[in-house]
Swiss-Prot record:
Gene Ontology terms for molecular function: SUMO transferase activity; zinc ion binding
Gene Ontology biological-process entries: cytokinin-activated signaling pathway; DNA damage response; double-strand break repair via homologous recombination; germ-line stem-cell niche homeostasis; negative regulation of DNA endoreduplication; positive regulation of cell population proliferation; positive regulation of cytokinin-activated signaling pathway; positive regulation of mitotic cell cycle
Protein family membership: Belongs to the NSE2 family.
Protein name (database record): E3 SUMO-protein ligase MMS21
Any Pfam family: zf-Nse
Renumbered zinc finger spans (SP-RING-type): 141-228
Function: E3 SUMO-protein ligase that modulates cell cycle progression and functions as a repressor of endocycle onset in meristems. May function downstream of the meristem patterning transcription factors PLETHORA 1 and 2 (PLT1 and PLT2) in root meristem development. Modulates the expression of the mitotic cyclins CYCB1-1 and CYCB1-2 and cyclin-dependent kinases CDKB1-1 and CDKB2-1 in root meristem. Involved in cytokinin signaling in root development.
Gene knockout outcome: Dwarf plants with short roots and defective meristems.
C-alpha cells in the first residue's frame, strides 16, 4: 500500500513538473507568434517602400523563428506525452532519452505543426498583397489556395462526440496521431468504454490512447485564432446584409 502511494506521489510530481515546463514553453510560443506578426507588419511597410532585399531578410528571419516555434511545440508535446505515459519502476528512468526519442519521433511527422506553414503563408500573402491585391501568388494552385489567411489549422470545427463547436469546448484536447480535437472528459470516457477504438471523426482511422490525447502547446492559440476569425466573418456578414438592405431601398 505504501509502495503504491509512493508511486502515485512520484507520478503526480512528474505531471506537475510537466505542466510547469509546458506553461513556460507556451509563453515562448506566444512570444514567437507576436514577433512574427510584428515582422509581417514591418515587411508590409518595407514592401510599400520597395525595399525588396530587406523584405527577403525578414522572411528568412521569420523562417528561422518558425523553426524554433516548431521545436518548442514538439518539446511541449513530448513532455506531456512522456509524463502521461510514465509508470514508476525500480530502476532509474532516463527521462532525457525518453524526451529525446519522443521529440525525434514528433519532428519526423510531416503534418505535426501545420500552423507553421499557415503563419509563413500569412507573411507572404501580406507582402504580396501590397502590390498585387486580388491576384494569386506565383506557384499557387488549388491545393495551395485551400490554406489561406482566413483559415485556421484546426482539422475539425466540432467535437465528434459532444457536437459542440471546438471554440466552445471547456477543456479541449487533441490526438497526437490524427490531430483531431475533442472535449477532454467526453473523449476519455469514450476511450475507457471502447478500448483500441479509432478516432470518432467519420472516416478517420487514427488510434486513440489516453496518453496521446492532450492539450498540446498550440491548441489553445489555434482555438483563439478561430474565435477571432469567426468574429471577423460575422462582422463581414452584418456589413454585407446592411449593404444589401441599403441597395434595395
Amino acid at each position: 500500500m505504501a509502495s503504491a502511494s509512493s508511486s502515485d506521489g512520484v507520478a503526480g510530481r512528474i505531471q506537475n513538473a510537466s505542466l510547469v515546463l509546458v506553461s513556460d514553453n507556451s509563453s515562448t510560443l506566444a512570444d514567437i507568434r507576436k514577433a512574427v506578426a510584428m515582422m509581417k507588419n514591418i515587411a508590409v511597410q518595407l514592401e510599400k517602400e520597395n525595399q525588396t532585399d530587406k523584405v527577403k531578410d525578414l522572411e528568412n528571419s521569420v523562417a528561422e523563428l518558425l523553426d524554433l516555434h516548431s521545436d518548442c511545440n514538439h518539446r511541449s508535446t513530448a513532455i506531456q506525452s512522456v509524463a502521461n505515459r510514465y509508470q514508476p519502476v525500480e530502476q532509474l528512468t532516463d527521462f532525457k532519452k525518453l524526451l529525446d526519442d519522443e521529440f525525434t519521433k514528433l519532428k519526423a511527422t510531416p503534418s505535426s505543426v501545420p500552423q507553421n506553414d499557415h503563419l509563413m503563408r500569412q507573411f507572404r500573402e501580406a507582402v504580396w498583397n501590397v502590390h498585387h491585391a486580388g491576384e494569386p501568388m506565383p506557384g499557387d494552385d488549388d491545393e495551395d489556395i485551400v490554406m489561406t489567411s482566413t483559415q485556421c489549422p484546426l482539422l475539425n470545427m466540432t467535437c465528434p462526440l459532444s457536437g459542440k463547436p471546438v471554440t466552445e469546448l471547456a477543456d479541449p484536447v487533441r490526438s497526437m496521431d490524427c490531430r483531431h480535437v475533442y472535449e477532454k472528459s467526453v473523449i476519455l470516457h469514450y476511450i475507457v468504454n471502447n478500448p483500441n477504438a479509432n478516432c470518432p471523426v467519420a472516416g478517420c482511422r487514427g488510434k486513440l490512447q489516453n496518453s496521446k490525447v492532450i492539450c498540446d502547446a498550440m491548441l489553445k492559440f489555434e482555438i483563439e485564432e478561430m474565435r477571432s476569425l469567426n468574429k471577423q466573418s460575422n462582422r463581414a456578414e452584418v456589413i454585407e446584409d446592411f449593404t444589401e438592405d441599403v441597395d434595395e431601398d
